[in-house]
């Protein structure tokens, strides 16, 4: 579980205090598989316990992992259920986890945002386990293998259409308060990402780096406008790499500029740069990182993502003038 905390020195009028509930590998939830009515009750009780703890800690927003890597945690007509729910790929858990999470969040006065991993599709073993239900089988043209993993290809025009189809399912059918994109970037250390054909076909004279950045921007723009056309009140956020001094490994690097441009172009509601750190020593350097990560754009706050296990289990580690729980 990761948490989101405001970094302003003075508390804003409307403060977001959010936590990521991670389903991949069962890191946060679920720990129980639903193979019986009792399993359903236990799995739901585990989530309720997490939500109760977050409510008691004064959180007001939950980012519930809804899509992992080519599989999902809601009843979808496009991608299969994640095996973490039942122990079987595509296994119906007997209830709709996303609908349940939304209802329980709203009971506690908390917002629920659907957290969707976008570009990565998992390693070869994972993709093979999904079989014919994998997007790599259904939509081969938009998928590429790279370094023993599979990815959606941001440079293919149909990629944004595919991602939008997933988002549309969620926004139209569920009372979500927001859509949150994770891993909306090219893979790390990927100068040879296999998109040369698409680059030649679609670049229109742009450099490779600029073309790749534009591909990601176009995905965000397309989905943001689609969401707002369906439900204008639903927030759209994304999680760029938070290591602002160490982004050379990413072909789409330059997230601070991307965020500022995205906000000014009105294609993103909230930027959530990720730290992904949980060492005690990181607590000392966190205020420095926070103060230099980016300057908030006009009309928006500045937020960052922390590791919730560290924060909730040892809150004194992250106590300081920049963070409050």
Enumerate the predicted regions with their spans.
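Aromatic-lined carbohydrate-binding/catalytic grooves of carbohydrate-active enzymes
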Residues: 57-93
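Aromatic-lined carbohydrate-recognition surfaces of secreted/lumenal glycan-active proteins
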Residues: 102, 106, 111-123, 180-187, ...
């Amino acid at each position: 579980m990761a948490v989101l905390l405001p970094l302003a020195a003075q508390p804003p009028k409307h403060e977001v205090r959010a936590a990521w509930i991670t389903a991949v590998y069962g890191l946060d939830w679920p720990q129980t598989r639903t193979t019986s009515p009792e399993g359903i009750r236990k799995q739901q009780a585990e989530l309720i316990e997490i939500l109760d703890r977050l409510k008691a800690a004064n959180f007001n927003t939950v980012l519930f992992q809804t899509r992992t890597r080519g599989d999902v945690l809601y009843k979808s007509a496009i991608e299969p259920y994640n095996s973490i729910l039942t122990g079987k790929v595509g296994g119906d858990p007997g209830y709709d986890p996303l609908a349940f999470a939304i209802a329980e969040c709203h009971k506690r006065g908390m917002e629920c945002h659907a957290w969707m991993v976008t570009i990565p599709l998992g390693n070869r073993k994972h993709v093979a386990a999904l079989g014919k239900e994998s997007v790599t089988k259904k939509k081969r043209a938009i998928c590429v293998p790279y370094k023993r993993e599979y990815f959606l290809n941001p440079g293919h025009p149909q990629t944004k259409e595919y991602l939008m189809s997933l988002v549309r399912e969620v926004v139209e059918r569920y009372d979500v308060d927001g859509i949150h994109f994770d891993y909306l970037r090219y893979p790390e250390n990927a100068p040879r990402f296999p998109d040369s054909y698409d680059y030649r076909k679609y670049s229109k004279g742009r450099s490779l780096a600029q073309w790749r950045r534009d591909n990601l921007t176009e995905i965000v723009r397309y989905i943001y406008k689609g969401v707002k056309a369906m439900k204008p009140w639903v927030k759209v956020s994304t999680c760029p790499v938070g290591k602002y001094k160490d982004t050379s490994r990413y072909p789409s690097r330059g997230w601070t500029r991307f965020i500022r441009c995205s906000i000014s172009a009105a294609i993103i509601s909230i930027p959530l740069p990720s730290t992904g750190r949980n060492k005690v020593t990181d607590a000392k350097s966190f205020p420095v990182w926070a103060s230099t990560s980016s300057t908030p754009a006009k009309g928006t706050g500045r937020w960052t993502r922390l590791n919730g296990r560290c924060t909730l289990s040892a809150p004194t580690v992250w106590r300081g003038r920049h963070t409050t729980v």
